[in-house]
Amino acid sequence: MAIDENKQKALAAALGQIEKQFGKGSIMRLGEDRSMDVETISTGSLSLDIALGAGGLPMGRIVEIYGPESSGKTTLTLQVIAAAQREGKTCAFIDAEHALDPVYARKLGVDIDNLLCSQPDTGEQALEICDALARSGAVDVIVVDSVAALTPKAEIEGEIGDSHMGLAARMMSQAMRKLAGNLKQSNTLLIFINQIRMKIGVMFGNPETTTGGNALKFYASVRLDIRRIGAVKEGDNVVGSETRVKVVKNKIAAPFKQAEFQILYGEGINFFGELVDLGVKEKLIEKAGAWYSYNGDKIGQGKANAITWLKENPAAAKEIEKKVRELLLNNQDSTPDFAVDGNDAEETEQDF
């Protein structure tokens, strides 16, 4: 619809005044020629990258990863850091739980010599450090482990047993308002690890909830629910965990998809195992009996030998990965893989 000429002039004058006062790019038309695609970082799991719909976690956004104890939350974030560092990005780890193991991080491929690490005394200090790193524009990925360990200063200075109702929720709510804009401007990915608590007296629906109030649920562009669903065994020895991740919230693609992969102890996500499975599923790798073949050449008898061949031939592995991403990310179906409980999707509780 054509706009009246006088209105057009008035709009142009208003836009000019806004850009003069607040800087170029402070207001623009949504369809203007600028990058509409969200830049992403791989999670280290091919199936999870595909479930997210954009090929990874989005830059400039807030992401929440939550789940029970020993479900793989920290491992997943360390894999994200390793993937980001391989792309030459700068990463920071805010270790509020004081439990980061540098030896394990190195095994997962993290360059610990170039990883910024902070062990803050209070929750306010941790969030101020996050904000300062985001405003610097020099840090690409920040991980906070975990929201439950972000203890307000008043609680630390008080005595055990004192009531501090809603302090952590208010602190998080204030921090989210401040952080969201700074993260977008600096294109920094901020990942919060969170723990699960049980709501008392819930008769119907999901009794589980996450700590730190409701603000994080609203501000997060992606929320991932990670669970251990089984054990990976070699003979009688348990060598890893079968893991399922549900995309509970997704603002960059269709939500409610899920991914399943293995986390091997001391190694991290079994990426090459996923590559073999997805390659066979998409008919990029041929499977006849126990033999696996690629481009007509046999690459191994049994999955373990096929994985070994891919590790020894990184160029072929990269080629298969690229083809899988092109096939599955370009043909994303907007229909959810599954439905979540109403409590997972609902975010209408009172914000502190």
UniProtKB/Swiss-Prot annotation:
Residues 343-352 have a biased composition (Acidic residues). It is found in: Cytoplasm. GO terms for biological process: DNA recombination; DNA repair; SOS response. Its main location: cytoplasm. Can catalyze the hydrolysis of ATP in the presence of single-stranded DNA, the ATP-dependent uptake of single-stranded DNA by duplex DNA, and the ATP-dependent hybridization of homologous single-stranded DNAs. It interacts with LexA causing its activation and leading to its autocatalytic cleavage. This is Protein RecA. Keywords: ATP-binding, Cytoplasm, DNA damage, DNA recombination, DNA repair, DNA-binding, Nucleotide-binding, SOS response. Belongs to the RecA family. Residues 333-352 are annotated as: Disordered. It comes from Klebsiella pneumoniae (strain 342). PROSITE patterns: RECA_1, RECA_2, RECA_3. The lineage of its organism: Bacteria, Pseudomonadati, Pseudomonadota, Gammaproteobacteria, Enterobacterales. InterPro entries: AAA+_ATPase (IPR003593), DNA_recomb/repair_RecA (IPR013765), DNA_recomb/repair_RecA_CS (IPR020584), P-loop_NTPase (IPR027417), RecA-like_C (IPR049261), RecA-like_N (IPR049428), RecA_ATP-bd (IPR020588), RecA_C_sf (IPR023400). Coiled coil: none annotated. It comes from the Bacteria. The keyword Amino-acid biosynthesis does not apply. GO terms for molecular function: ATP binding; ATP hydrolysis activity; ATP-dependent DNA damage sensor activity; damaged DNA binding; single-stranded DNA binding.
